[in-house]
From Swiss-Prot:
Residues 1-56 form a transit peptide. This is Signal recognition particle 43 kDa protein, chloroplastic. InterPro entries: Ankyrin_rpt, Ankyrin_rpt-contain_sf, Chromo-like_dom_sf, Chromo/chromo_shadow_dom, Chromo_domain, CPSRP43_chromodomain_3, Multifunctional_regulatory. Residues 84-135, 270-320, 321-373 form the Chromo domain. GO terms for molecular function: disordered domain specific binding; identical protein binding; metal ion binding; protein domain specific binding; protein-macromolecule adaptor activity. Its main location: plastid. Disruption phenotype: Plants show a reduced level of the major light-harvesting chlorophyll a/b-binding proteins (LHCPs). Keywords: ANK repeat, Chloroplast, Coiled coil, Magnesium, Metal-binding, Plastid, Repeat, Ribonucleoprotein, Signal recognition particle, Transit peptide. One of its GO terms (biological process) is protein import into chloroplast thylakoid membrane. Component of the chloroplast signal recognition particle pathway. Required for post-translational targeting of proteins into the thylakoid membrane but seems to be dispensable for co-translational targeting with a translating ribosome present. May be able to function independently of cpFTSY and FFC/cpSRP54 in targeting LHCPs to the thylakoids. Acts as a highly specific chaperone for LHCPs, preventing aggregation and being able to dissolve aggregates.
Length: 373
């Protein structure tokens, strides 16, 4: 298989049980910091932290001069690197540019507050995040369900991927639905290619997940960094998947299912102007169609073309634009109503069966006739 996606990182985060606090380094010099919120700029003995939203406030206590004794100097050196004690993380949310913030429960009883991840010891973040990402990378529906409370379902890893992208790539439509119901962004793009959950499901050949995402409202027109939609990506992979290799047969079948689901969504709301050409037979028949919105002609599988349009093409009927109805009569069979139609692209008017004439034009014609007709 040609690698279109980057392999998902399944490495768990390491927890250092010896660390459980936010560390503030002592100042390296007496010069003022360029940031008013930089803890490194504060000559502290003990700091009480209180982050509220994006605001970091620090209360400084007076710094006492050390004595000449070695014991007191060591004590001051130790206290100059004090900590704001963390009890645990109780919530998370995404910040700008893929950064994370965590709701901290403090050991000193201070009100919980939001703190940027960069200010929190790695072991504290790891203890909170590891179960979540382990569950996501295993598509563990039960574990994800238990961990959802007070957590941002759109939390991102180092590659900007959410849990939804992982479970989509792993093929768990149950996990996809669980996360979607929890409010997951169905169209989130990662930072390693601009891939969405739909791209992941298409690229890893998960037709059931593709169908679920489409049903849930995922935008099939979202493009990755190469400008490819999930449908275009699936087509690209199918082209590079060997036809004669028995080992790839199942993969090709899966890709065709993915493409069929996505094509069905693309053409569901597209209106065909006319069929230009036909190729293939039976279930493999395709039509080259011209769209009413003026888009380029495209080859479309027969199942996605309205039956009446396909039948008209097969019967040799052509489409033209009617300008108005200028006459009415009963057909040769004595029953069928026919209308004399004036065309925009033809000089001669023609008699057409009622079924072939726009009902709006028929109504306008009838309104123009005397009441006794």
């Amino acid at each position: 298989m040609q690698k279109v996606f980057l392999a998902m990182d399944t490495c768990a985060l390491v927890i250092h049980q010896s660390l459980s606090r936010i560390k503030l380094s002592p100042p390296k010099s007496s010069s003022s910091s360029s940031s008013a919120f930089s803890p490194e700029s504060l000559p502290i003995r003990r700091i009480e932290l209180c982050f509220r939203g994006a605001i970091c406030a620090a209360v400084q206590r007076n710094y006492e001069e050390t004595t000449s004794s070695v014991e007191e100097a060591e004590e001051d050196d130790e206290s100059s690197s004090s900590y704001g004690e963390v009890n645990k993380i109780i919530g998370s949310r995404t910040a700008g540019e893929g950064a994370m913030e965590y709701l901290i429960e403090w050991k000193d009883g201070h009100s919980p507050s939001w703190v940027p991840s960069s200010y929190i010891a790695a072991d504290v973040v790891s203890e909170y995040e590891t179960p979540w990402w382990t569950a996501a990378r295993k598509a563990d529906e039960q574990a994800l369900s238990q961990l959802l409370e007070d957590r941002d379902v759109d939390a991102v890893d180092e590659n900007g991927r959410t849990a939804l992208l992982f479970v989509a790539g792993l093929g768990s439509d149950k996990c996809v639905r669980l996360l979607a119901e929890a409010g997951a962004d169905l169209d989130h793009r990662d930072m390693r290619g601009g891939l969405t959950a739909l791209h992941m499901a298409a690229g890893y050949v998960r037709p059931e997940v593709v169908e679920a995402l489409v049903e849930l409202g995922a935008d099939i027109e979202v493009e990755d960094e190469r400008g490819l939609t999930a449908l275009e990506l699936a087509r690209e992979i199918l082209k590079t998947t060997p036809k004669g290799n028995p080992m790839q047969f199942g993969r090709r079948i899966g890709l065709e299912k993915v493409i069929n689901v996505l094509e069905g969504q693309v053409f569901e709301y597209a209106e065909v102007d006319e069929i230009v050409e036909k190729r293939g037979k039976g279930k493999d028949v395709e039509y080259l169609v011209r769209w009413k919105d003026g888009g380029d002609c495209e080859w479309v599988k027969g199942v996605h073309v309205a039956e009446d349009v396909a039948k008209d093409y097969e019967d040799g009927l052509e489409y033209a634009v009617a300008e108005s109805v200028i006459g009415k009569r009963v057909g040769d069979d004595g029953k069928t109503i026919e209308y004399l139609v004036k065309w925009t692209d033809m000089s001669d008017a023609t008699w057409e069966p009622q079924d072939n004439v726009d009902s709006t034009l028929v109504l306008l014609y009838q309104q123009q006739q005397p009441m006794n007709e």
